[in-house]
């Protein structure tokens, strides 16, 4: 019953929102994609525009870049995306030897300046399309460069609206921050999870602040009482006693945490130490807490997350991915790994779609600018959709946002369980 209720309400909440996904099939029976204006930029050095293959086939080798934190505090996210993308590329390359993807992964250490340097390295390496960046602040910096250069980017997990705003070549596969905030409030209200809600968020982080703002607005609209709103910054993310005491004194029976898993792990530990045990509700940034080194997963028992991916889903595509990821990494994949897997598939299906509608496509040595215009035309084509492990029938709008329904999962006995 809970699954049915969740599916009905989330479909309504997000039916008109935009987000992304990719996967095994593309549906495009009505209307062909168009290339648009391909003269907005000159080809990269040594690159030329590709000619149609003539038979509807997709051929050649696509140089695909990935940017994310492979080291540093956010490395769990970056490596999850990298490993997911590598599995997808291996599968795609096995489908047809006439079309191959070459993957180039660059570390940005979750730093905007380093991320821009990584982007320049990818351009120097003749990369044509980019999956990334993984986190929001670096993506804001890189997306500005890519928009100016006319390089197509599909970010697996940078969820701020500012990432795509005013940039027609930047697309998201993840939920946008506003959608996460409003959907969370709706779910809490519809399922009567709380009478009094407290919020702890990072007011120095665009991701956390964006989700908080739309959560607060939607909660007010729904009559959901928010009794405590406290903040922290990256520099103060060690002691949450004051924030937890404020929530406890206000009588909160649910704590909404639109934050990443590192500070969330400390909040769970410190709440337990002080005997404060409200329901805990997070969003996609908390995914990964179960694999955090040194974290006692018993502290996360009963935590609810809103996410596009559930590793315990019973469909064949998810089961196959979970097995391959576990064989490769030795752990259950997170939502970030699933996003990383879906991104190369979305790009692959888009190129297939274009080739089928335009007599073929050979991407070898094709300029990133020409590929950018092709991918924009396909991703915004109403007849193009993608089925992936993070969503079925996903479509994009002209703002680069994807439309897909989230899933609620609860942590039970150290694993995610669909609700």
What is the role of each PLM region?
Residues 1-10:
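Positively charged n-region of N-terminal signal peptides that target proteins for export
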Residues 17-21:
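C-terminal motif of bacterial Sec signal peptides marking the signal peptidase cleavage site
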